[in-house]
Amino acid sequence: MEVEEAAYRTVWSEPPKRPAGRTKFRETRHPVYRGVRRRGGRPGAAGRWVCEVRVPGARGSRLWLGTFATAEAAARAHDAAALALRGRAACLNFADSAWRMPPVPASAALAGARGVRDAVAVAVEAFQRQSAAPSSPAETFANDGDEEEDNKDVLPVAAAEVFDAGAFELDDGFRFGGMDAGSYYASLAQGLLVEPPAAGAWWEDGELAGSDMPLWSY
């Protein structure tokens, strides 16, 4: 697609040699788009836009393509006609017109000016419908999949409440293998041949009785 766009000249790569606008009358030509000028309305006010394109091989001849509501639509019409009349030698207003605009049939170019004008109008209308169409079902499905992936890491509030610290409070029997704290440390001290700590020194009402008391003396 990039190679296809690079094969065409655009108004951005080859700007006009002279400033847009007539010298004897007020400026009506579009400052950027090729083949587009304003029709009616004061400069800066809302108006309609007309488009015309030069006919190859006929010096001074121009093909009238019609009147359009926006300058962009008129510029697209110019590109469609230029592609039909000049092929890869066309200078486009938009680089993507080479692949986004519906092609004008070769039979239309052979039918003369009216055939080209009618085919260009059909191409511009089809392009506008395509641009205004909603996203395809495949894109919608992909977006839904992304939302599901994002929601996987979100923990519901109801589930989070289950992990309250109080719900997992363990008693001494579970901590010390079915024994109370005193019996557990007495058994441990006997295995290590050391004096066990004083009974009741470890837990009192579920909390440490004294944080500065040594575990046991050697």
From Swiss-Prot:
GO terms for molecular function: DNA binding; DNA-binding transcription factor activity. Induction: By cold stress. InterPro entries: AP2/ERF_dom, AP2/ERF_dom_sf, DNA-bd_dom_sf, DRE1A-I. Residues 1-26, 131-151 are annotated as: Disordered. Residues 32-95 bind DNA. It holds the Pfam family AP2. Keywords: Activator, DNA-binding, Nucleus, Stress response, Transcription, Transcription regulation. It is found in: Nucleus. One of its GO terms (cellular component) is nucleus. PANTHER family: DEHYDRATION-RESPONSIVE ELEMENT-BINDING PROTEIN 1B, DEHYDRATION-RESPONSIVE ELEMENT-BINDING PROTEIN 1D. Belongs to the AP2/ERF transcription factor family. ERF subfamily. Transcriptional activator that binds specifically to the DNA sequence 5'-[AG]CCGAC-3'. Binding to the C-repeat/DRE element mediates high salinity- and dehydration-inducible transcription. Confers resistance to high salt, cold and drought stress. This is Dehydration-responsive element-binding protein 1B. It comes from Oryza sativa subsp. japonica.
